[in-house]
Amino acid sequence: MEKYENLGLVGEGSYGMVMKCRNKDTGRIVAIKKFLESDDDKMVKKIAMREIKLLKQLRHENLVNLLEVCKKKKRWYLVFEFVDHTILDDLELFPNGLDYQVVQKYLFQIINGIGFCHSHNIIHRDIKPENILVSKSGVVKLCDFGFARTLAAPGEVYTDYVATRWYRAPELLVGDVKYGKAVDVWAIGCLVTEMFMGEPLFPGDSDIDQLYHIMMCLGNLIPRHQELFYKNPVFAGVRLPEIKEREPLERRYPKLSEVVIDLAKKCLHIDPDKRPFCAELLHHDFFQMDGFAERFSQELQLKVQKDARNVSLSKKSQNRKKEKEKDDSLGEERKTLVVQDTNADPKIKDCKLFKIKGSKIDGEKAEKGSRASNASCLHDSRTSHNKIVPSTSLKDCSNVSVDHTRNPSVAIPPLTHNLSAVAPGINSGMGTATIPIQGHRVDEKTKKCSIPFVKPNRHSPSGIYNINVTTLVSGPPLSDDSGADLPQMEHQH
């Protein structure tokens, strides 16, 4: 990991931290996830192994790609491509919502990336604005830092469960262990209205409050989920809220078009078995109207190629810079400087630089000789022919025999250049990154969800859902201990 220069801290959590770094050889900016000492903590080791195995098989234009995996002193380091902008940043810049075409392009790529994960029997389970990166070219990258959260001011406390509650499907809230890919589709539905309107759809303050928000909009839970709710010891003594009058999406957001409302409703079906697959969503009228899907697919490929070229140009620029520095260094070393060494022979100390008046012919000869020589001499700018006297008493400070009668210039040892850059190591101290929060997010989200894992030993009742990426039960286990504490999952989609 010595080849990476640490540029600052991006986020941290109970299992490690994420750092912004620069590859010293190529100049490429990357994000490095640094786990805690995994060999001493079985939970950290399990999470690290699961994420490494999953990400190694995921290569897609709409997923942040894993570039390298390293282990040093019992710690695992995951090197990712770095993208420093998220959809959450957009929502904070535009609190009243994003433009229609922007949302269309974002959603198309989000669904495309999630669909790729689902095709590999992987569910993300933590789809939310801050986990969706956007490159400078507009390419969306789903990321899953899991334990990493944006740093905030000291004293603000939140749990990992609170941070993602707003986008959790009802089956997760009631404790259903037979959930599947439909939980990601639910999160997509939450994003649809949030990106258009600039406010979270279901901003619950607790699990029961979250269910209340959902039921107020979509109606009662399905019988199976109601039964699971009353059997769940977490909700002992608590009853589901009674909804006298619903506020459906079309009434809550009358300015949204019918096609947008229809897309959101399909994703937010209260019954997970009736939510569509990602492939079906991409064929929805929201994407097919006016030939958007076909047109944007071609545009997206150009954006991806542009990002790839930018990375390549960055590497070439860094290499050219290094070559130039090397050439400049060699050029400096090749220069012969006329410097009087105070520790040299006493006769040398008495050497003086004289301007000799000569004939015009002598001047022309001296000028020609000056052009032919690569040596650089100290001279009066008003004359082109200088002479050092006495030439026979000069000595070379580098102990190399030189015939000074032929070359009266003083030779000195080449200067020693220290070109090594002093850069902090990967474990050096890191600065903090602060992100300005505006609008309703200050009160509802930031105050509760800003400082990550201040109490890492305190687990939420539904803590079993806090791992961000897992696989469905159809495939072989990723590792012997990778799913010991996770709920079993079935294929629902």
Swiss-Prot record:
It is an enzyme of class 2 (transferase). SMART domains: S_TKc. The active site is at D126. ATP binds at V10, G11, E12, G13, S14, Y15, G16, M17, V18, K33. It catalyses: L-seryl-[protein] + ATP = O-phospho-L-seryl-[protein] + ADP + H(+); L-threonyl-[protein] + ATP = O-phospho-L-threonyl-[protein] + ADP + H(+). The keyword Transferase applies. A motif ([NKR]KIAxRE) lies at residues 45-51. The keyword Kinase applies. One of its GO terms (molecular function) is cyclin-dependent protein serine/threonine kinase activity. InterPro entries: CDK, Kinase-like_dom_sf, Prot_kinase_dom, Protein_kinase_ATP_BS, Ser/Thr_kinase_AS. Residues 311-338, 363-384 are annotated as: Disordered. Its EC number is 2.7.11.22. Keywords: ATP-binding, Cytoplasm, Kinase, Nucleotide-binding, Nucleus, Serine/threonine-protein kinase, Transferase. Residues 4-287 form the Protein kinase domain. The [NKR]KIAxRE motif seems to be a cyclin-binding region. This is Cyclin-dependent kinase-like 2. Residues 320-336 have a biased composition (Basic and acidic residues). PROSITE patterns: PROTEIN_KINASE_ATP (PS00107), PROTEIN_KINASE_DOM (PS50011), PROTEIN_KINASE_ST (PS00108). SUPFAM superfamilies: Protein kinase-like (PK-like). It is found in: Cytoplasm; Nucleus. Belongs to the protein kinase superfamily. CMGC Ser/Thr protein kinase family. CDC2/CDKX subfamily. One of its GO terms (cellular component) is nucleus.
